[in-house]
Regions:
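A structural signal for conserved, well-ordered secondary-structure elements
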Residues: 1-302
């Protein structure tokens, strides 16, 4: 199998990561995220059609009636429509929306009308941020316990790198960020960590077994040995996500986009961030070999 010099390209990879992070951070600071109803609060109306309608027609009908900041998507089947309105709750809004849609001659049934308060949205936003921080903290403790603290630093930097780039992409293109996307971001953390752990495990074993101290060469061998597994896993995952993106409907469209970005970036970071960072952190063979106990030499003496 061909051997790729991954570590030889690490400076180019670091530059690429730095550029992506800079763009993501600038976008998050300037444009911020386009938060969905789950975080901002608003009204949710679900209606059922006798035959599948055109989403653009539904949106245009409501906009013509004076509704603003409308999100229209299918919910489950093509004839079930979910309408999100960024407005204060009106107990009659469900019936108003239904009457407007019926005016076009369609058979429309109101399924439900719910309101998500702004305070609830703020709580969800705070809890989701706290949950992400807790997840990263647990990951750092796990990697430090299973490997060594330098591995933990590399893993955490890689995960933060992945999360920022996914969030930055959603900010840059103003794709709605809701609870399903948050779930995808947490899934990206798990996926990226899994890739990183596999590469780390091979690096650790190669360091222990190798008779040379050329760390870049040892890292290259480890990454090349796990490359086929990494590409196979990422490739099959991307195929499934593409199917979800095309066939899954609007409800999981943004979820699939977040995972597609995350899987691609996570595969990159497991090699060029998590692993390559071990070189400037000066990982050495002695870091992975337990120090001898003081009384071991005395016990071996006759």
């Amino acid at each position: 199998m061909r051997q790729f010099d991954f570590m030889g390209k690490r400076r180019l990879a670091f530059t690429t990561s730095a550029v992506m992070l800079l763009i993501a951070l600038v976008s998050l600071a300037v444009q911020q995220l386009s938060l969905g109803l789950d975080f901002t609060g608003g009204t949710l109306v679900e209606v059922s059609y006798h035959t599948a309608p055109s989403l653009d027609t539904v949106r245009q009908t409501l906009e013509a009636a004076g509704f603003q900041d409308i999100s229209v998507q299918t919910f489950g089947t093509a004839d079930e429509i979910l309408i999100r309105l960024q407005q204060a709750f009106d107990p009659n809004v469900g019936q108003q929306v239904t009457d407007l849609l019926r005016a076009g001659g369609d058979q429309v049934t109101l399924v439900r009308a719910e309101f998500v308060g702004a305070q609830v949205g703020e709580q969800l936003r705070d809890q989701s941020g706290l949950g992400m921080l807790v997840a990263l903290g647990v990951v750092m403790l796990y990697v430090a316990f299973r490997f060594q603290y330098k591995f933990a630093v590399g893993a955490i930097v890689a995960l933060i790198h992945d999360v920022i780039i996914v969030l930055g992409a959603f900010s840059l293109f103003q794709i709605e960020f809701d609870l399903t996307v948050l779930a995808a971001v947490l899934a990206v953390i798990g996926y990226s960590l899994n890739d990183t752990i596999i590469v780390y495990d091979r690096i650790r074993e190669n360091i222990r077994l190798s008779r040379i101290d050329d760390m870049p060469a040892i890292f290259n061998d480890a990454i090349n040995q796990t490359l086929s597994r990494t590409l196979a896993t990422s490739g099959t995952t991307i195929l499934v996500l593409l199917a979800l993106l095309v066939l899954g409907g609007d409800m999981i469209h943004n979820f699939a986009i977040a995972l597609l970005i995350g899987v691609g970036v996570g595969t990159f970071s497991s090699i060029y961030v998590a692993s390559a960072l071990l070189l400037p952190l000066k990982l050495q063979r002695t870091d992975l070999i337990p120090a001898p106990k003081e009384n071991e030499d005395a016990e071996e003496l006759p």
